[in-house]
């Protein structure tokens, strides 16, 4: 059952945000199981209450799907004093800064283990929608607290904000190992603050966060409406900024659009550089898929890459999820990934783009690219330029539409299906060792899919 738990958490990691998974799923440990229940160990009572409220059904679902049968979960708190009276989390969040503290000495903590090893600048694909944020992040990583401070990066879910935040941390730790770097989500900041209040260790908490050289905070919008957390983060921000320490923050919204955020915090977020990340365009999605398939060693044919990239999704995480899904199906079934297999597997997610592309559209675009007329593609002229353009158009019709060989032939001047098959196979063979032809077809596909 331990293996089932491990597989279930791996599945959750693929669909949850980096910060949520690291904060709330990673700290949970498998204990034991019986016929109906899986017993899991959590670090604190507050953590248990949070999981009960926000993630219990998620965990039950993940375990049950992975195991192939329904399981319940039982959360066990791993604390020495489980009977101690614990204040309500909301009370702590609102009144936290008024709590009595016990002086505790602590050295600033350098949190490198929380950095995702997969999120580096080398593995980040830069495109028109993210190149400004990418350049700003690299500038900060190479010269912390010297260029843009704070750096505020905002954009929609799954567009690469966490990737850039982690990449900054990796670069600074590699080039300046003497600097203390802490990466955490705003949710984790609140959770650790509440824990410190309950244990009366706010001095230790403040010493940790206010003596850093670099603070990287993900999803700052989480502190919206949380008065006590905003108060504590305000003083943490001031302490670091006054000491000229680097602060980088991400959010799903522009500072002015974050609701229930104190004006003094909002204005501080706007002191430095604000960089946005836009959804990737077609070219960037293609580059991302090629990079991810290389990293994961999932063999993804060119036509499948274009099929995925042309989907309506504007979320990089969803693209990665589709890639992983195809890779898993291919591995489990022992079959290669093909365009037909991808269409069948992902039809509920992205539908079938073939209905949007017609033979006439392909003929029009190919003719324009070769400086020909559409009638030339339908003729029987044997000039080399005509023949190649006609074969490419037929190959694209086979690849990008639902038409049968006879239907395609009918639209190319009444050619029979054997002629269509021959033309398509001719291009298949040529693509294996003709990079120039590959680029021509890639360019035409980009036009068709826009």
UniProtKB/Swiss-Prot annotation:
GO biological process: DNA replication initiation; regulation of DNA replication
SMART domains, A to Z: AAA, Bac_DnaA_C
Signal peptide limits: none
One Pfam family here: Bac_DnaA
Region annotated Domain I, interacts with DnaA modulators, chain positions: 1-69
Sorted UniProt keywords: ATP-binding, Cytoplasm, DNA replication, DNA-binding, Lipid-binding, Nucleotide-binding
Keyword Iron-sulfur: no
InterPro entries hit by this protein: AAA+_ATPase (IPR003593), Chromosome_initiator_DnaA (IPR001957), Chromosome_initiator_DnaA-like (IPR020591), Chromosome_initiator_DnaA_CS (IPR018312), DnaA_C (IPR013159), DnaA_dom (IPR013317), DnaA_N_dom (IPR024633), DnaA_N_sf (IPR038454)
Binding site for ATP: 158, 160-162
Region annotation (Domain III, AAA+ region) ranges: 114-330
Region: Domain IV, binds dsDNA, residue numbers: 331-450
Family that this chain belongs to: Belongs to the DnaA family.
Role according to the record: Plays an essential role in the initiation and regulation of chromosomal replication. ATP-DnaA binds to the origin of replication (oriC) to initiate formation of the DNA replication initiation complex once per cell cycle. Binds the DnaA box (a 9 base pair repeat at the origin) and separates the double-stranded (ds)DNA. Forms a right-handed helical filament on oriC DNA; dsDNA binds to the exterior of the filament while single-stranded (ss)DNA is stabiized in the filament's interior.
Protein name: Chromosomal replication initiator protein DnaA
Organism lineage string: Bacteria, Pseudomonadati, Thermodesulfobacteriota, Desulfuromonadia, Desulfuromonadales
């Amino acid at each position: 059952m331990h293996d089932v738990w491990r597989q279930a958490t791996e599945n959750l990691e693929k669909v949850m945000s980096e910060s949520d998974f690291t904060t709330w799923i990673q700290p949970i440990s498998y204990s034991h199981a019986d016929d109906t229940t899986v017993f899991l160990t959590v670090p604190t009572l507050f953590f248990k209450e949070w999981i009960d409220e926000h993630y219990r059904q998620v965990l039950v679902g993940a375990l049950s799907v992975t195991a192939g049968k329904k399981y319940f979960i039982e959360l066990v708190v791993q604390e020495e004093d489980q009977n101690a009276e614990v204040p309500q989390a909301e009370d702590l969040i609102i009144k936290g800064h008024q709590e009595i503290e016990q002086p505790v000495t602590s050295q600033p903590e350098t949190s490198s283990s929380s950095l995702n090893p997969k999120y580096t600048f080398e593995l980040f694909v830069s495109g028109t929608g993210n190149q400004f944020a990418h350049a700003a992040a690299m500038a900060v990583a190479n010269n912390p607290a010297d260029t843009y401070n704070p750096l505020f990066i905002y954009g929609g879910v799954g567009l690469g904000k966490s990737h850039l935040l982690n990449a900054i941390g990796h670069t600074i730790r590699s080039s300046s190992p003497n600097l203390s770097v802490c990466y955490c989500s705003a949710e984790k900041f609140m959770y650790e603050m509440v824990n410190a209040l309950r244990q009366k260790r706010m001095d230790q908490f403040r010493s940790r966060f206010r003596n850093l050289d670099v603070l990287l905070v993900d999803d700052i919008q989480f502190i919206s409406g949380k008065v006590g957390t905003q108060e504590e983060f305000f003083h943490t921000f001031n302490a670091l900024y006054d000491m000229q320490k680097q602060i980088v923050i991400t959010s799903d919204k522009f500072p002015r659009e974050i609701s229930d955020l104190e004006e003094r915090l909002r204005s501080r977020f706007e002191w430095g550089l604000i960089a946005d990340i836009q959804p990737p365009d077609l070219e960037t999605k293609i580059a991302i898929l090629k990079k991810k398939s290389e990293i994961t060693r999932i063999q993804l044919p060119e036509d499948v890459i274009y099929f995925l990239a042309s989907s309506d999704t504007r979320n990089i995480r969803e693209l990665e999820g589709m890639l992983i899904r195809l890779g898993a199906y291919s591995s489990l079934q022992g079959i290669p990934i093909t365009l037909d297999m991808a269409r069948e597997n992902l039809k509920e997610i992205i539908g079938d783009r073939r209905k949007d592309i017609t033979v006439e559209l392909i003929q029009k675009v190919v003719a324009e690219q070769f400086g020909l007329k559409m009638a030339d593609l339908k003729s029987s002229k044997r000039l080399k330029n005509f023949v190649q353009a006609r074969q490419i158009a037929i190959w694209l019709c086979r690849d990008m539409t639902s038409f049968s060989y006879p239907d395609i032939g009918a639209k190319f001047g009444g050619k029979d299906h054997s002629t269509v098959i021959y033309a398509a196979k001719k291009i298949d063979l040529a693509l294996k060792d003709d990079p120039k032809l590959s680029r021509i077809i890639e360019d035409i596909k980009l036009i068709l899919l826009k």
